Regions:
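Amphipathic alpha-helical assembly/interaction segments
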Residues: 1-129
């Protein structure tokens, strides 16, 4: 099994671990008023990333775009968690474990993008020299 494929599988497992933590520790303890607004948005985002990771594992779609989307959604999820803490919908102690998992996921995504992402060649993405 190639290193890129193996790291992709690790990425999917790390995302599933994060999802389990978010569902069990963060969303379950949210106040009802926030669970159906911010919580629903967080759930939707988690499933969008899971869908992209399945596409990556099946090798369908543009790898670079999918990895980029996973990276953006992971950062968005971290922002949502920070917002939840600021509005007192999420306990402060829940931030650090979630942030550590998201940072680890970001590192894996960055490594995958570096080693084999099909970067689109356009004016927005000039060639590295």
């Amino acid at each position: 099994m190639g290193e890129s494929v193996e790291r992709g599988l690790i990425l999917q497992q790390k995302w599933e671990d994060l999802s389990e933590y978010v569902f069990a520790a963060i969303l379950r303890d949210m106040p009802k008023s926030e669970r159906f607004t911010l919580g629903a948005d967080m759930r939707g985002l988690i499933w969008q990333v899971e869908e992209a990771l399945v596409q990556l594992s099946l090798r369908t779609g543009n790898r670079w775009a999918l990895l980029n989307m996973v990276d953006v959604k992971a950062k968005t999820l971290l922002s949502m968690i920070r917002l939840g803490i600021r509005i007192r919908a999420i306990a402060d102690k829940r931030y650090e474990p979630a942030a550590q998992r998201l940072v680890e996921i970001g590192k894996i995504v960055g490594g995958l993008k570096k080693t084999g992402g099909e970067r689109p060649q356009s004016a927005e993405y000039p060639r590295d020299r």
